[in-house]
């Protein structure tokens, strides 16, 4: 039994690491075009310009991922929607399944491990490129972390995130009565 549990845990970590690696690959490719991508939707009206077709044309879909209806499905089961909005390149990352209950979106599952790894191994090293890394929540307070260009004494800065900060932020999405989304804005 211990061997099976160990194997299962190792496979989960392998999938998570492959997912983080995939986001890094995608981001490295998109950063080469960041100035153009940001201006695809220059209005500050919140309108989104979806980049699924652009990602496919640039051959940036990470190995093992699939692109369906403009959304990226990862090796770990998370789903990312990438778009330009308000002069920013934005990733909306769903870390689990969800459903609607009386027109309210509720997470059925939320991978705190993947959330923690993305914040620690993806967002934190990109502190100088990111403007924001945050967790959108439908029912409670949003937690923002700011990139270097917006970092100040009054803000929570990505570069200063501790493992405890990351765990607390990601663990806040374990409840079953709301929907959480990890958001990265470049």
Describe each PLM feature range:
Residues 63-186:
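Intrinsically disordered, low-complexity regions enriched in Pro/Ser/Thr/Gly and acidic residues
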Residues 1-14:
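C-terminal juxtamembrane segment of a hydrophobic transmembrane alpha-helix
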């Amino acid at each position: 039994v211990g061997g099976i549990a160990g194997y299962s845990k190792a496979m989960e970590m392998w999938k998570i690491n492959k997912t983080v690696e995939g986001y890094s690959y995608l981001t490295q490719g998109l950063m080469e075009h960041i100035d153009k991508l940001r201006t695809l939707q220059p209005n500050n009206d919140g309108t989104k310009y979806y980049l699924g077709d652009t990602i496919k044309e640039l051959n940036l879909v990470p190995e093992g991922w699939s692109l369906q209806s403009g959304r990226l499905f990862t090796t770990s089961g998370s789903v990312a929607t990438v778009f330009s909005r308000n002069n920013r390149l934005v990733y909306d990352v769903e870390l689990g399944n969800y459903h609607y209950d009386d027109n309210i979106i509720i997470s059925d599952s939320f991978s705190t491990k993947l959330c923690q790894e993305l914040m620690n191994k993806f967002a934190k090293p990109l502190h100088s490129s990111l403007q924001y890394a945050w967790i959108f929540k439908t029912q409670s307070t949003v937690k923002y972390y700011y990139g270097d260009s917006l970092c100040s004494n009054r803000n929570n800065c990505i570069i200063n995130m501790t493992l405890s900060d990351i765990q607390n932020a990601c663990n806040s999405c374990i409840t079953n009565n709301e929907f959480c989304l990890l958001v990265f804005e470049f």
